[in-house]
């Protein structure tokens, strides 16, 4: 058997070689012990908050009650998944979540790339810094502040939006209540999120553009290339791998629309449009107590499975048509 292995591979690792490899690994760890020490906290964080909670996934397949514990609760299989998919509200939740997610992706993703390309063109550093500061600051506002600002701005009686409408349509013109109009929920939700995160999302593309060799710009200018052609043939190809990777990552959150903002914007007028999977999980798992805890866990697991399928599919497609992929 050993001779066949040697004949096939042409190489057999001896005991001395294994000891030497282990010694070499210890030397590398000892040489860079500071870096390995810095890894302790992030690894501990992942183990504690990402991997350890996976033990609780079994709640999705049980009729969980606190008195019985996770392992003692009755096993019901995929019953909670079936109940959710067959519920009357399922397709409304799924539709609203998909619409907001795709709407946000199609609008915010290209706009952040465009902003990065435009800022890269600006040569006046003071103006560039002012624009960056103005676009970055909203990202650090809490959701509560953002929604509060929206209610003040779009107030049909005394908001800024009212004055803008009257400026163009005349005083006394009818002002729509955007925060109380169901059909407007998608637009107000998505565009307020774009305003809040546009600058911050462009940072990674600005960083990628900083790696472009300045000699390429000089050569293109000598050849008489316009600024648009430079952007088309130098800037975009440079950040294209970054764009693909970020798109793949975003596809893994296709159903992960946060519940906080939707709940704060939610009212009786837009409830049909603002009910998302995340808000439903919040109401089932936290507002109704342990009675619906298993159902909420099952819905969250369903959400994660769909997200994984999306990110895997997009990654495989990217791998076939291009060179960039996550794995």
Predicted regions and their residues:
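Short, Lys/Arg-rich, polar N-terminal cytosolic tail immediately upstream
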Residues: 1-28
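A structural signal for multi-pass alpha-helical bundles of membrane permease subunits
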Residues: 28-327
């Amino acid at each position: 058997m050993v001779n066949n292995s040697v004949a096939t591979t042409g190489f057999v690792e001896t005991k001395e070689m294994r000891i030497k490899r282990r010694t070499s690994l210890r030397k590398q760890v000892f040489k860079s012990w500071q870096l390995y020490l810095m890894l302790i906290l992030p690894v501990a964080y992942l183990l504690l908050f990402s991997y350890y909670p996976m033990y609780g996934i079994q709640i999705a397949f049980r009729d969980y009650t606190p008195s019985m514990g996770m392992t003692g609760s009755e096993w019901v299989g995929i019953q909670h998944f079936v109940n959710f998919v067959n519920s009357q509200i399922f397709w409304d939740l799924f539709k609203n979540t998909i619409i907001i997610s795709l709407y946000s992706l199609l609008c915010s993703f290209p706009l952040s790339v465009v902003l990065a390309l435009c800022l890269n063109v600006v040569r006046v550093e003071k103006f560039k810094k002012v624009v960056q500061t103005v676009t970055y600051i909203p990202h650090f506002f809490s959701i509560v502040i953002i929604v509060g600002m929206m209610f003040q701005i779009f107030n049909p009686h005394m908001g800024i939006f009212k004055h803008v409408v009257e400026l163009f349509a005349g005083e006394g013109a009818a002002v729509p209540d955007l925060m109380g109009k169901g059909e407007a929920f998608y637009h107000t939700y998505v565009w307020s999120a774009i305003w809040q995160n546009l600058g911050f999302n462009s940072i990674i593309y600005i960083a990628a553009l900083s790696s472009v060799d300045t000699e390429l710009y000089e050569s293109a200018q000598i050849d008489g290339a316009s600024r648009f052609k430079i952007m088309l043939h130098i800037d975009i190809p440079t950040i294209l791998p970054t764009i693909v990777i970020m798109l793949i990552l975003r596809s893994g959150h296709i159903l992960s629309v946060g519940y906080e903002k939707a709940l704060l914007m939610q009212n009786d007028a837009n409830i049909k449009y603002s009910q998302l999977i995340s808000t439903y999980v919040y109401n089932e798992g936290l507002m109704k107590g342990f009675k619906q805890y298993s159902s909420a866990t099952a819905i969250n697991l369903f959400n994660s499975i769909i997200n994984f399928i999306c990110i895997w599919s997009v990654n495989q497609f990217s791998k076939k048509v291009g060179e960039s992929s996550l794995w």
